[in-house]
Every structure is written in structure tokens, then in C-alpha cells.
Amino acid sequence: MSKVKVNDTIEKNVISAYEMLHKHSICHGDVRSANIIVRDDDSVVLIDFERGLLNADKMMLIEEEDEVRHMMRAGRVIRS
């Protein structure tokens, strides 16, 4: 796997992926670039739900969303 720099499309897709989880009260539990796979078309796949939680409370989801946005703002590279 190679590393790619986060662009606007990837950032939007990562945030959307986490928002979809949170809409269903699912907390991923391990927000980090190693758990995000970027496809050639810049779509993303979240992996490693070992720490995931169903029916997460709202505060957990808000905190996780903040982590995701912080990671994206930092411009970290993610694997493809």
C-alpha cells in the first residue's frame, strides 16, 4: 500500500463515512489513518472495527467526529 496526501475529495469522503456510521449510532472507536483505505477513485473504506461500538451515546459520536475532523485538518497521509 502506498500513502496519499489528503485532498478535498478524500477529506469529504472520510467525513461522510464516519457521519454514516454515526447516523446509525455506530462508533468506530479507533480513528487513525491506518484504518482508512483510499481507493483509486478517492472513495474510502473504513477498516478495523475491533473497538467499534453499536448504540454509542451521542457524546462518544461527537468526540469521534471531532477526532476525524482534526485528523483531516492536520493533512495526515492515509493509505491506499
Where are these regions (language model features)?
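C-lobe/activation-segment region of protein kinase-like
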Residues: 4-10, 22-28, 33-80
